């Protein structure tokens, strides 16, 4: 029976894991977290999936308490700028498409919608709320989306009943610090020391980690949260890493923390802006913006990328320190080997174009608890865990490649190369089908990876991948109910914009 878990590495991945295991198992499992005091954390301004709400709810944490501690803000979706033409943009929100007479509103927009209004504005409330910089909550704390039940308590991704209408922006280092306080208060043993050697038994399983000051720290299960270096999963156990560089070549990023001159300009969305050799994120925190340029060093040098980033978001601010990051893009073929599970960057990472970093961590932790060993180490459970994690990451990879294949620009060598680069087989089939109709549940990746049908539809239409004609069935149906729903969306948008506070106004009220 598993009695003790040793987590090697802190940061967001380590402390999310420690907190979740304590929330799940309480004192029935001993948890130790070992982290070096000398490791520089990669954490920058972090954007998340809406599913992260389930993580904080599972821990019993109040958003009004933890979010201000972490310089947090709200995220209603992602705004994609300049992926087609300069000045053009669209939103990829968390809001699901409404359905009328068996067809979603995107199908109806293609058939009878007013093309003078963009797809995202016509079909989503979120588009106009983002434009107006509105918070997703009233000043009394009530949620604008009445169909979402906030009383679910300890629910997981698998139990979610409705898409939660927002996610968060936050300072990843502050979240790690906050969760460390939570975990330590609940009995997690915290060891600040350098791991000098990893011990293995005669089977090759990890027996303990040997530290500089605290000697050997033994355990039954070891969780590798050591980042891209993969101290346990790769360096010790020899896990094979599968690179995605053939389809996702971006391998570096440079980040800046930029003070925001006007507080009221705080936006409730992440921005992904196409650049000459990649794209730039803008993540609004409470008092500043996090900006970063994700690029391929095949097309631009780190120095050139930093200059392009500075000239775009902080001209004349040479005093702002740049953080250069080298990224390992891909996944381990197995993220659970013997008695070691990799979580976070040590397991898998893709460029943060759709804010999947925290989502990967959360999904890995939840699946670890669901597949937790009992009296014996069941190889069927371990295999099932590895299969689920691989399918999740591969599904996200496919979705990200869509962004580049669909982008309507070829103005630099980088973007020209994106058109000719290889793509996953599954994506090729989806793009073939997209020429005749919008994708549906049967054509989306069959395993859960976080991106549902509406996400694929939104990216296709936003990037200009439009079917040659609407669904023929709609030409034989009464369009009146759909036209009434378009009008209802417009009216509800007007009412919400009038009623909701600005993003900054609401967040200032809970500081």
Curated annotation (Swiss-Prot):
Q: Which residues bind L-tryptophan?
A: 50, 93, 160, 163, 450, 454
Keyword check for Zinc, yes or no. no
Q: Which residues bind FAD?
A: 10, 13, 36, 39, 42, 44, 47, 195, 345, 358
Q: Which positions in this protein are listed as binding chloride?
A: 356-357
> According to its UniProt record, which reaction does this protein catalyse?
L-tryptophan + FADH2 + chloride + O2 = 5-chloro-L-tryptophan + FAD + 2 H2O
The organism's superkingdom is given as Bacteria
Q: EC annotation? A: 1.14.19.58
InterPro entries xrefs: FAD/NAD-bd_sf, Flavin-dep_Halogenase_NPB, Flavin_halogenase, Trp_halogen
Active site residues according to the UniProt entry: 75
Q: What happens when the gene is disrupted?
A: Mutant cannot produce pyrroindomycin B, but still produces pyrroindomycin A, the nonhalogenated derivative.
Residues at the site labelled Important for activity = 354
Q: Name one Pfam family in it.
A: Trp_halogenase
Q: Which GO terms describe its molecular function?
A: monooxygenase activity; nucleotide binding
Task: Respond yes or no to whether keyword Flavoprotein is given for this record.
Answer: yes
Q: What is known of its domains?
A: The tryptophan-binding module binds the substrate in such a way as to expose the C5 position to the key lysine and glutamate residues at the site of chlorination.
Q: Which family does it belong to?
A: Belongs to the flavin-dependent halogenase family. Bacterial tryptophan halogenase subfamily.
The record's subunit annotation is: Homodimer.
Protein's UniProt name = Tryptophan 5-halogenase PyrH
Say which species the protein is native to. Streptomyces rugosporus
In the UniProt record, what gene is named as encoding this protein?
pyrH
